[in-house]
């Protein structure tokens, strides 16, 4: 039986990548060492790190005036690092509130700045994203922060906000590398790796050079982007094995047509699943159609009393980790880059079969 893992994160990794990791685990390229054993300053690992950065730059077409940082601490640490680095003498920042992760970012930013919530979708249980004509931007804000894809709620924003000269900061943890974006429109992009990049423990930050070097008073050394940039992400020991695995994922993506190729596949996968959910009233998708995520698909059963039976039957078919987040309930299928189309088709087949037996 083929197993398909729909976990929101840590999440499915490409089978090809896992097999390469397995083959190289004990002896990387004849070095006599596992990547886990290498000095992060040795020539072997320095080469791995440089190649990973070069491949990510190529995949995302990252301009030369942006630094790529391989950090730790997850997006949750970035909720503090963004204001610490981007306030740059200003007192306030703009935040869009579209779900649980937006709320966490807002809560943390309030420790360092006056937060202006430009718009919120909490009025409809975070089931949509407010269009920009509804935003109340502050021209004096240090930056504008938003979450393009809310992992829990499955709400995605497919356009990039316009804020004039005010830098845009984006938590792309669950959407990065799923489709092309114009990096030059952002001041800072950050993402925990454990959803669409690689193993947990790695956080990728892409930051425009002119936004580094002026931190708020009392900023810890480890929270200063410029320190990490000046030390090529090796101020402290980085998450070496996670960086190596991420580098293999970058090569896997390049071999599949890059981000344009992945977007085509991801849209096809998402369409299959949403069409199945929309075809019946036995299931429901709570998200407005314009904001339905390509990566995280929450859905509910008409009768919540059937939830446990649904999950049990799914597990018996090898469909794992479909339980929704504890804060919202229901189901959630995360269909990241590494989820093959066959996995989505298997889930759709199960949706039909379960309804036939219980509808």
From Swiss-Prot:
Pathway: Amino-acid biosynthesis; L-serine biosynthesis; L-serine from 3-phospho-D-glycerate: step 2/3; Cofactor biosynthesis; pyridoxine 5'-phosphate biosynthesis; pyridoxine 5'-phosphate from D-erythrose 4-phosphate: step 3/5. It catalyses: O-phospho-L-serine + 2-oxoglutarate = 3-phosphooxypyruvate + L-glutamate; 4-(phosphooxy)-L-threonine + 2-oxoglutarate = (R)-3-hydroxy-2-oxo-4-phosphooxybutanoate + L-glutamate. GO terms for cellular component: cytoplasm. Binds 1 pyridoxal phosphate per subunit. Signal peptide: none annotated. The modification N6-(pyridoxal phosphate)lysine is found at residue 195. Keywords: Amino-acid biosynthesis, Aminotransferase, Cytoplasm, Pyridoxal phosphate, Pyridoxine biosynthesis, Serine biosynthesis, Transferase. It holds the Pfam family Aminotran_5. Its EC number is 2.6.1.52. It is found in: Cytoplasm. GO terms for biological process: L-serine biosynthetic process; pyridoxine biosynthetic process. Its main location: cytoplasm. L-glutamate binds at residue 41. HAMAP family: SerC_aminotrans_5. Homodimer. Belongs to the class-V pyridoxal-phosphate-dependent aminotransferase family. SerC subfamily. Catalyzes the reversible conversion of 3-phosphohydroxypyruvate to phosphoserine and of 3-hydroxy-2-oxo-4-phosphonooxybutanoate to phosphohydroxythreonine. This is Phosphoserine aminotransferase.
